[in-house]
Protein backbone atom coordinates (compact mmCIF):
# COMPACT_ATOMS: atom_id res chain seq x y z
CA UNK A 1 0.00 0.00 0.00
CA UNK A 2 1.22 3.47 -0.83
CA UNK A 3 0.79 6.23 1.72
CA UNK A 4 -0.70 9.63 1.09
CA UNK A 5 1.31 12.82 0.86
CA UNK A 6 -0.51 15.58 2.72
CA UNK A 7 0.81 18.94 1.53
CA UNK A 8 0.00 21.72 4.01
CA UNK A 9 0.40 25.28 2.83
CA UNK A 10 -0.80 28.73 3.74
CA UNK A 11 0.33 32.29 4.26
CA UNK A 12 2.71 33.38 6.96
CA UNK A 13 0.58 33.98 10.03
CA UNK A 14 -2.09 31.41 9.13
CA UNK A 15 -0.96 29.15 11.96
CA UNK A 16 0.74 26.30 10.08
CA UNK A 17 3.35 25.80 12.80
CA UNK A 18 0.70 25.92 15.53
CA UNK A 19 -1.46 23.42 13.64
CA UNK A 20 1.47 21.06 13.09
CA UNK A 21 2.38 21.22 16.77
CA UNK A 22 -1.21 20.68 17.94
CA UNK A 23 -1.88 17.86 15.46
CA UNK A 24 1.47 16.12 15.95
CA UNK A 25 0.37 13.71 18.69
CA UNK A 26 -3.03 12.69 17.28
CA UNK A 27 -1.48 12.18 13.85
CA UNK A 28 1.45 10.19 15.27
CA UNK A 29 -1.00 7.96 17.14
CA UNK A 30 -2.59 7.22 13.77
CA UNK A 31 0.77 6.39 12.19
CA UNK A 32 1.18 9.59 10.21
CA UNK A 33 4.69 10.98 9.81
CA UNK A 34 5.14 14.74 10.08
CA UNK A 35 8.23 15.78 8.17
CA UNK A 36 10.86 18.04 9.69
CA UNK A 37 11.85 20.32 6.86
CA UNK A 38 15.29 21.79 6.28
CA UNK A 39 15.47 25.58 6.19
CA UNK A 40 18.20 28.20 5.89
CA UNK A 41 17.03 30.10 8.92
CA UNK A 42 17.33 29.28 12.59
CA UNK A 43 14.48 26.99 13.66
CA UNK A 44 14.14 29.12 16.79
CA UNK A 45 13.57 32.18 14.61
CA UNK A 46 10.65 30.61 12.78
CA UNK A 47 9.03 28.76 15.64
CA UNK A 48 8.79 25.50 13.75
CA UNK A 49 10.39 22.12 14.25
CA UNK A 50 12.87 22.50 11.40
CA UNK A 51 16.47 21.57 10.80
CA UNK A 52 18.40 24.81 10.40
CA UNK A 53 21.32 24.82 7.95
CA UNK A 54 23.49 27.44 6.30
CA UNK A 55 22.93 28.27 2.63
CA UNK A 56 26.17 26.42 1.77
CA UNK A 57 25.01 23.33 3.67
CA UNK A 58 21.65 23.50 1.91
CA UNK A 59 23.33 23.66 -1.51
CA UNK A 60 25.47 20.64 -0.60
CA UNK A 61 22.40 18.66 0.48
CA UNK A 62 20.53 19.66 -2.65
CA UNK A 63 23.41 18.60 -4.93
CA UNK A 64 23.54 15.27 -3.07
CA UNK A 65 19.83 14.67 -3.89
CA UNK A 66 18.95 14.72 -0.19
CA UNK A 67 15.62 16.42 -0.89
CA UNK A 68 12.45 15.04 -2.43
CA UNK A 69 11.36 18.65 -2.89
CA UNK A 70 13.16 21.95 -2.47
CA UNK A 71 12.33 25.55 -3.21
CA UNK A 72 13.35 29.10 -2.50
CA UNK A 73 11.00 31.75 -1.14
CA UNK A 74 11.36 35.03 0.71
CA UNK A 75 15.15 34.83 0.58
CA UNK A 76 15.26 31.39 2.22
CA UNK A 77 15.77 27.82 1.04
CA UNK A 78 13.42 25.02 2.06
CA UNK A 79 13.88 21.27 1.62
CA UNK A 80 11.77 18.20 2.28
CA UNK A 81 14.02 15.18 2.97
CA UNK A 82 13.95 12.39 0.40
CA UNK A 83 13.11 9.99 3.26
CA UNK A 84 9.44 10.77 2.60
CA UNK A 85 9.58 8.55 -0.50
CA UNK A 86 10.55 5.58 1.66
CA UNK A 87 7.78 6.32 4.17
CA UNK A 88 5.19 6.66 1.40
CA UNK A 89 6.33 3.37 -0.17
CA UNK A 90 5.95 1.70 3.24
CA UNK A 91 2.33 2.86 3.36
CA UNK A 92 2.69 5.72 5.82
CA UNK A 93 0.80 8.92 5.33
CA UNK A 94 3.24 11.83 5.38
CA UNK A 95 2.43 15.46 6.18
CA UNK A 96 4.75 18.16 4.88
CA UNK A 97 4.81 21.91 5.44
CA UNK A 98 4.89 23.00 1.82
CA UNK A 99 4.71 26.19 -0.21
CA UNK A 100 1.85 27.58 -2.25
CA UNK A 101 4.38 28.68 -4.86
CA UNK A 102 5.76 25.14 -5.20
CA UNK A 103 2.41 23.29 -5.34
CA UNK A 104 2.45 22.75 -9.13
CA UNK A 105 5.93 21.18 -9.00
CA UNK A 106 4.96 19.06 -6.00
CA UNK A 107 1.91 17.77 -7.89
CA UNK A 108 4.09 16.81 -10.85
CA UNK A 109 6.25 14.65 -8.60
CA UNK A 110 3.37 13.41 -6.41
CA UNK A 111 0.23 13.48 -8.59
CA UNK A 112 -1.99 12.07 -5.85
CA UNK A 113 -0.93 14.50 -3.14
CA UNK A 114 -3.63 15.88 -0.88
CA UNK A 115 -3.33 19.65 -0.86
CA UNK A 116 -4.46 21.48 2.28
CA UNK A 117 -4.70 25.26 2.17
CA UNK A 118 -4.72 26.70 5.68
CA UNK A 119 -6.25 30.12 5.66
CA UNK A 120 -7.59 32.79 7.95
CA UNK A 121 -9.86 35.76 7.45
CA UNK A 122 -7.86 38.77 6.19
CA UNK A 123 -8.45 40.83 9.34
CA UNK A 124 -7.34 37.94 11.57
CA UNK A 125 -4.23 37.50 9.43
CA UNK A 126 -3.52 41.23 9.60
CA UNK A 127 -3.77 41.18 13.42
CA UNK A 128 -1.51 38.11 13.70
CA UNK A 129 1.13 39.67 11.47
CA UNK A 130 0.99 42.96 13.38
CA UNK A 131 1.33 41.09 16.69
CA UNK A 132 4.47 39.32 15.42
CA UNK A 133 6.10 42.68 14.84
CA UNK A 134 8.44 41.48 12.07
CA UNK A 135 7.03 43.68 9.31
CA UNK A 136 5.85 47.24 8.84
CA UNK A 137 2.14 47.93 8.26
CA UNK A 138 2.91 48.58 4.58
CA UNK A 139 4.72 45.24 4.25
CA UNK A 140 1.79 43.52 5.93
CA UNK A 141 -0.69 45.06 3.49
CA UNK A 142 1.51 43.93 0.59
CA UNK A 143 1.62 40.43 2.10
CA UNK A 144 -2.19 40.39 2.40
CA UNK A 145 -2.51 41.41 -1.27
CA UNK A 146 -0.08 38.63 -2.32
CA UNK A 147 -2.07 36.16 -0.21
CA UNK A 148 -5.26 36.97 -2.13
CA UNK A 149 -3.42 36.56 -5.46
CA UNK A 150 -1.93 33.22 -4.38
CA UNK A 151 -5.29 31.87 -3.23
CA UNK A 152 -6.92 32.81 -6.54
CA UNK A 153 -4.11 31.21 -8.56
CA UNK A 154 -3.98 27.76 -6.95
CA UNK A 155 -5.08 25.00 -9.30
CA UNK A 156 -6.30 21.48 -8.77
CA UNK A 157 -8.19 19.93 -5.90
CA UNK A 158 -7.43 21.22 -2.44
CA UNK A 159 -9.01 21.18 1.00
CA UNK A 160 -9.48 24.64 2.44
CA UNK A 161 -9.10 24.71 6.19
CA UNK A 162 -10.05 27.90 8.06
CA UNK A 163 -7.89 28.68 11.09
CA UNK A 164 -9.56 31.98 12.01
CA UNK A 165 -11.08 30.51 15.16
CA UNK A 166 -9.96 28.06 17.82
CA UNK A 167 -6.95 25.90 16.98
CA UNK A 168 -8.65 22.81 18.45
CA UNK A 169 -11.47 23.23 15.93
CA UNK A 170 -8.94 23.39 13.10
CA UNK A 171 -7.19 20.23 14.33
CA UNK A 172 -10.53 18.39 14.53
CA UNK A 173 -11.44 19.51 11.00
CA UNK A 174 -8.09 18.30 9.64
CA UNK A 175 -8.42 14.92 11.37
CA UNK A 176 -12.00 14.51 10.13
CA UNK A 177 -10.95 15.33 6.56
CA UNK A 178 -8.15 12.77 6.75
CA UNK A 179 -10.67 10.16 7.94
CA UNK A 180 -11.03 6.73 6.46
CA UNK A 181 -8.97 3.63 7.04
CA UNK A 182 -5.53 4.87 6.04
CA UNK A 183 -2.47 5.23 8.26
CA UNK A 184 -3.42 8.81 9.02
CA UNK A 185 -7.03 7.99 9.86
From Swiss-Prot:
Keywords for the protein's UniProt record, in alphabetical order: ATP-binding, Nucleotide-binding, Transferase
Stretches assigned to coiled coil: none
Keyword Phosphoprotein found: no
Catalytic activity, reaction form: alpha-D-ribose 1,5-bisphosphate + ATP = 5-phospho-alpha-D-ribose 1-diphosphate + ADP
A biological process from GO: organic phosphonate metabolic process
Residues noted as binding ATP in the record, renumbered to the chain: 10-17
GO MF terms, alphabetically ordered: ATP binding; ribose 1,5-bisphosphate phosphokinase activity
The EC number(s) this enzyme carries: 2.7.4.23
SMART domains: GuKc
Pathway membership, UniProt: Metabolic intermediate biosynthesis; 5-phospho-alpha-D-ribose 1-diphosphate biosynthesis; 5-phospho-alpha-D-ribose 1-diphosphate from D-ribose 5-phosphate (route II): step 3/3
Database matches in InterPro entries: GK/Ca_channel_bsu, P-loop_NTPase, PhnN
Signal peptide interval: none
Superkingdom field: Bacteria
Gene3D superfamilies per UniProt: P-loop containing nucleotide triphosphate hydrolases
This protein's record includes keyword Membrane: no
Function field: Catalyzes the phosphorylation of ribose 1,5-bisphosphate to 5-phospho-D-ribosyl alpha-1-diphosphate (PRPP).
Family affiliation: Belongs to the ribose 1,5-bisphosphokinase family.
Official protein name in the record: Ribose 1,5-bisphosphate phosphokinase PhnN
Organism encoding this protein: Pseudomonas paraeruginosa (strain DSM 24068 / PA7) (Pseudomonas aeruginosa (strain PA7))
Gene transcribed to yield this protein: phnN
Amino acid sequence: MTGRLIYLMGPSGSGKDSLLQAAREPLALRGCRIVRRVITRSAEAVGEDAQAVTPAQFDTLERASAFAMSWRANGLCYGIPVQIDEWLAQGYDVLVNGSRGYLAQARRRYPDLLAVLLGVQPEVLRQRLLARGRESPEEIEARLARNAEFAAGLEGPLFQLDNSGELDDTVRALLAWLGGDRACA
